[in-house]
């Protein structure tokens, strides 16, 4: 009843206060609002400029005369997807040495804009980049967020915080800040905050518990969350003891053959409200392409990338035998253990996000999110609705953007996708994003 009344009040307010010429209605269609409740059949969403002003049923909402109508009948209307783990500087090529050796000077001209476009076209309207060259990624964020390059709302970590630099980039490509000590860690987190980073990324199990504790504590003091790339159970325990906290994320959770985490690890994850980021597609993508090379001919891959880069990425799978690649082995060797551990965490009540690591090997931006959602459902036992909520509302919480995005509600930004299908029956329908609206602007 309250919901009905509030919709009505908003609708009446709309008619009197707003100029109908500026209002757009998404009319018909089933609305999944991101909160996890029953969908609204024959839904209507009114947008005024960049904001949503009403969400409800056709019977509840008056559409002012002169309103522009977008017909969404037969389709699913839901919040734009949020991916909390992407990399704008890679496009799914199988060989990082080759990629960075050849293309570091094409990041701004071609690669990052192509990644941004591919994400947005796939219905991903907000992302968190978890590690790239500092100068390029701050530039990219400002270009996209000021509207100069089409792409999702972009939040960034800047560099990986590690004990050693990454091996495959040149000296001039500053994607790593090496941590020397706990004091150094604090200083670097403060420096990143000053520079305007949105999140801190640790990517090294060699960081000591003291160094991690300094990173977590300083980041939390600065109002930043931390995403930690961790595989081994012992390293997860170290990060938990070091104070990884509420809605910080453990990226790549579930890795390795072991079929359960020790009870103390699960308990700390629950007590500290750490969010689980499984990035399953970053493990399974190579298997999918090796077993079905036709995937590299997907027209969406061709559509989103400059022709020569697409050709080079395709060649890296079509003309190289990758069956002895460690990722291919891991895809099958770790699957049973990962599934068992993810289900253990799910049953215990851990918070789950949807996190793709898109751009990594065989994990192109146009496919990452819908594939990860399907794998999440299969491997964790989450319901389709739970996965949809994780990909929208929960991910907005992780990014500290829950007041602006993540659910379809009056007052929030109009980041909305229209899916040609029914993801509550078949999550793979998320592949068929027909329209993408970001901030009230229709991008496709
Ligand atoms: Zn990553």
Describe the residue ranges of each PLM region:
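Positively charged n-region of N-terminal signal peptides that target proteins for export
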Residues: 1-4
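Bacterial N-terminal signal peptides
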Residues: 6-16
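Histidine-rich, glycine-flanked metal-binding segment
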Residues: 22-24, 31, 35-78
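Metal-associated gating/positioning segment near the N- to mid-region
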Residues: 76-143, 210, 231-251
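Active-site mouth loops of central-metabolism enzymes
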Residues: 97-110, 169-184
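Divalent metal-dependent hydrolysis catalytic cores, especially in the metallo-beta-lactamase
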Residues: 112-135, 152-159, 193-205, 225, ...
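Active-site core of metal-dependent hydrolases
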Residues: 202-334, 353, 360, 396-399, ...
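His/Asp/Glu-enriched, well-ordered alpha-helical/loop segment
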Residues: 319-330, 335-423
């Amino acid at each position: 009843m309250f919901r009905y009344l509030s919709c009505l009040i908003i609708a009446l307010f709309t008619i009197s206060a707003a100029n109908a010429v500026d209002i757009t209605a998404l009319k018909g269609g089933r609305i999944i609002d991101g909160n996890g409740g029953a969908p609204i059949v024959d839904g209507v969403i009114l947008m005024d400029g960049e904001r949503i002003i009403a969400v409800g049923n056709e019977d509840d909402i008056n559409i002012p005369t002169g309103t522009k109508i977008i017909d969404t009948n037969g389709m699913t209307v839901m919040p734009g997807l949020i991916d909390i783990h992407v990399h704008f500087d890679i496009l799914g090529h199988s060989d990082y040495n080759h990629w960075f050796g050849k293309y570091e000077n094409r990041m701004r001209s071609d690669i990052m804009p192509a990644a941004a476009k591919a994400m947005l076209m796939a219905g991903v309207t907000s992302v968190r980049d978890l590690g790239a060259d500092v100068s390029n990624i701050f530039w990219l964020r400002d270009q996209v967020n000021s509207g100069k390059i089409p792409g999702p709302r972009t939040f960034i970590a800047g560099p990986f915080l590690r004990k050693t630099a990454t091996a495959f980039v040149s000296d001039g490509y500053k994607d790593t800040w090496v941590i020397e000590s706990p004091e150094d860690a604090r200083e670097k987190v403060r420096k990143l905050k000053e520079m305007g980073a949105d999140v801190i990324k640790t990517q090294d199990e060699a960081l000591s518990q003291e160094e991690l504790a300094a990173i977590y504590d300083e980041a939390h003091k600065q109002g930043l969350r931390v995403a930690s790339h961790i595989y081994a159970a012992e390293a997860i325990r170290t990060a938990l003891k070091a104070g990884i906290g509420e809605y910080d994320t453990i990226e790549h959770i579930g890795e390795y053959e072991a079929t359960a985490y020790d009870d103390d690890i699960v308990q700390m994850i629950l007590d500290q409200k750490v969010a689980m980021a499984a990035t399953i597609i970053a493990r399974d993508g190579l298997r999918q392409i090796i077993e079905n090379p036709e995937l590299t001919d997907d027209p969406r891959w061709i559509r989103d990338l400059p022709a020569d880069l697409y050709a080079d990425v395709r060649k890296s799978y079509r003309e190289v035998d990758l069956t002895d690649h460690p990722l291919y082995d891991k895809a099958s060797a770790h699957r049973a253990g990962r599934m068992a551990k993810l289900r253990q965490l799910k049953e215990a009540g851990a918070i789950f996000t949807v996190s793709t690591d898109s751009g990594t090997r065989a994990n192109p931006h146009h496919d990452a999110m819908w594939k990860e959602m399907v794998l999440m459902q299969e491997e964790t036992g989450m319901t389709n609705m739970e996965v949809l909520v994780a990909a929208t509302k929960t991910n907005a919480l992780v990014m500290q953007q829950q007041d602006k995005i993540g659910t379809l509600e009056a007052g929030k930004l109009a980041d909305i996708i229209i899916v040609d299908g029914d993801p509550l029956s078949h999550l793979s329908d998320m592949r068929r994003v027909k329209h993408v609206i970001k901030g009230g602007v229709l991008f496709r």
